[in-house]
Every structure is written in C-alpha cells, then in structure tokens.
Curated annotation (Swiss-Prot):
Post-translation changes: Contains 8 disulfide bonds.
Species annotation: Naja haje haje (Egyptian cobra)
Family: Belongs to the CRISP family.
Name of this chain's protein: Cysteine-rich venom protein 25
Primary localisation category: secreted
Protein's cellular compartments: Secreted
GO biological process: defense response
Entry keywords, A to Z: Disulfide bond, Secreted, Toxin
Lineage, broadest ranks: Eukaryota, Metazoa, Chordata, Craniata, Vertebrata
Length: 25
C-alpha cells in the first residue's frame, strides 16, 4: 500500500513537472 502510494505520488509529481515545463514554453 505504501509502495503504491509512493508510486502514485511520484507519477503525479512527474506529471506536474511536465505540465510546468509545457507552460514555461
């Protein structure tokens, strides 16, 4: 469960970074 939550958090963080990158272009 903890591993799943960690994976989910990492995925959301990565997605946010991608969105931020796109917005900066």
């Amino acid at each position: 469960n903890v591993d799943f939550n960690s994976e989910s958090t990492r995925r959301k963080k990565k997605q946010k970074e991608i969105v931020d990158l796109x917005n900066s272009l």
